[in-house]
Amino acid sequence: MEPFFRRVFSVAKRVLRQLQHDKRFIGLSLMVPVAIIYVLYVFFDSLNNPLLNANAYVFPFGAYIVHFLTFVLTAIVLVRERVTETLTRMMVNGYQQLEIILGYLIAYSTLATGQSLLVLVEITWLFKLDYSFATLASIYLVMWLLAVISMALAIFVSNFANNEGQVFPFIPLVTLPGMFLSGMVISIEVLPEWAQVLSRFTPVYYATEVLHALTSGGNLWDESAALLSLPAYGFVVLVLASFTLRDND
């Protein structure tokens, strides 16, 4: 097992070194969600509706923004790695699919850590939310798990694209169901049965279930099934990604 982990961390170190030189990618990953969250604040503030409980929406929307941007940026970067034949060279040098995928996931998870923290702090500050530290830490955990799953989805989807242009059709296919079928906008119960079934195939549904419980005064284990579904979902996607990863055609 030691050579396996050594190769995984070797991939992670290479990707981290590459990220250090890609200031544009880091800037987009960190600043774009900050800007979108501010627009979200302006939107809710402009509604000026005392009957609207913004607290029930802002964290699910924040988590969705992290999900969307993480998926898009990671997928594009990974396809670029394929175009430049970086993946091909790693496979030629003896790296296995799972080692490559875990290495990329570890490296990009460091960025997801900062991104999720920024979104959490900004939402709490702008909307003047007064949750306990334990609740905020739980919200952060859910957002971070969703970001990691988004990266796993991006790795999986990038396996079916040979250039950046081929990624774009996957963006609405993967991300839009999470907005409309997760309970973030309207309650799941009012959707048709087929839509309720379909909602279980998007990770945003499980994240939203847990976030709603947390912002309503509950704790992580009030929605334990949804919480445990997040790492399970990520595991399944990683397995699929490892089986479909290939070198450049």
Residue ranges of model-derived segments:
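Hydrophobic alpha-helical transmembrane segments of polytopic membrane proteins
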Residues: 138-161, 179-182, 232-240
